[in-house]
Amino acid sequence: GDFFMATRVGMVSLGCPKNQVDAEHMLYDLRKEGFQIVSDAALSDVVIINTCGFIESAKQEAIDTILEFCTLKQEGRIKAVIATGCLAERYRDEMKKEIPELDAVVGIGSNGKICDIIREILLDKQAVCSYGAKTELSMEGGRIISTEPFYAYIKIAEGCSNNCTYCAIPSIRGKYRSRRMEDIVKEARWLAENGVTELVVVAQDTTRYGEDIYGKSMLPELLTALCEIDGFKWIRTLYCYPERITDELLDVIAKEDKLVKYLDMPIQHCDKTILKRMNRHGDRETLTALIKKIREKIPNVTLRTTLITGFPGETKEQFEELCEFVKEIRFERLGCFAYSPEEGTPAEKFEDQVPLKDRERRAEIIMEEQMIISDSLNEAALDSEVEVVCEGFDRYAECYYGRSQADAPEIDGKIFFLSEDKVRVGEYVKVKIDDTMDYDLIGSKM
């Protein structure tokens, strides 16, 4: 056993929070088995790259990262490089062929075997490929929190059964399977006891939670149960599917003080024909009605959405309609992606692919529109008072920065603020907004 005691393991986790949670579970297992966890992967003996395989740019980032560490291995600075996560799951055969320097390629279903895999490659130097069935939930057991100490993600389900035609996630992650409510609550309690004050609830589709094991969506009940845990100040839910946003869910968000008035609802498009070809539902009218209802039920709600431009068959007219919709709705937060044709998805085989430069240009146009909207919403926030959680001190700008309820960690903007007193990371303070800067706000502690 002593042979491995001194083995230092570094983890680089790419992509979304759901992937990060997987990484945190692996780190916990490694530490429990006596491996040393180091925060700077370049200083480790074994590097695990927990990859994202979602769209082209994410795959490129993953491959670049792997190659970067393979170079360190060739220089003799590290002993082994392991790929885990979505890309490893998705391109299991190609990966080992294309990047022979990899010591192990580990699929999503084999994350639980990570300690054995490391021992194996260090002992007999044979490359390992390991894939397990994706039916189990790998989320029980402990984690090592890798985010800022005051917030953490909690994954309530694995996989997805929406089968949108552009998306490879169901084939990578398997079909939707919910965790038992008592397991989630137990993990959340543990997070609260460890100083987490902001809990971020994630899954590929949080609104589907419980359908597979309880026969109906249990997200409202789950959120209510999480609100009863002492220690949490803000509870945030990401990745809500528009058709599953029920009155019951909206009422719970409106009623519970701890639930932040923030809804992340990717709609992808507003055109009926395109949504249908995406294997999604609704149209401009139903979406407009839903958003109106959300804003009535939850006054001052922050709405975040995601759009795809240049989906196969998107005409100029349909794109212009999307622009009009964006202008009309005025989402508080918006991300837009140029469509990326993914291997093995139905949309990749659709005849009428839109040229890449048009897809990208359309995304730029939407983001330019959104910039104007953000500016005017920020303008409206001037002189208001907001509660901000401090995330740190920016030496360059010589001020503190943090987020309000309206900003999700890692994806939304920041609030920079001056303060005469020292403010601790994770402390919640009242800030008066004095100025704006692109997507960020500037203020002073009251």
Q: Which residues does each PLM region occupy?
A:
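Contiguous mid-protein beta-loop-alpha structural module that forms a pocket-lining wall or clamp
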Residues: 314, 321, 329-331
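Active-site proximal loops enriched in glycine and acidic residues that flank catalytic Cys/His/Asp
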Residues: 203, 239, 267-269, 305-309, ...
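Short, hinge-like loop/turn segments at secondary-structure boundaries
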Residues: 99-100, 121-124, 217-219, 253-255, ...
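Proteins enriched for Cys/Gly/acidic motifs involved in redox and nucleic-acid/cofactor modification
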Residues: 4-209, 248, 259, 263, ...
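Terminal RNA-binding accessory module
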Residues: 349-446
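Conserved SAM/AdoMet-binding glycine-rich loop
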Residues: 80-85, 90, 193-317
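Conserved, mostly hydrophobic/aromatic
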Residues: 184, 201, 237, 265, ...
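Radical SAM enzyme [4Fe-4S]-AdoMet core and its adjacent flexible, acidic
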Residues: 16, 210-227, 231, 277-278, ...
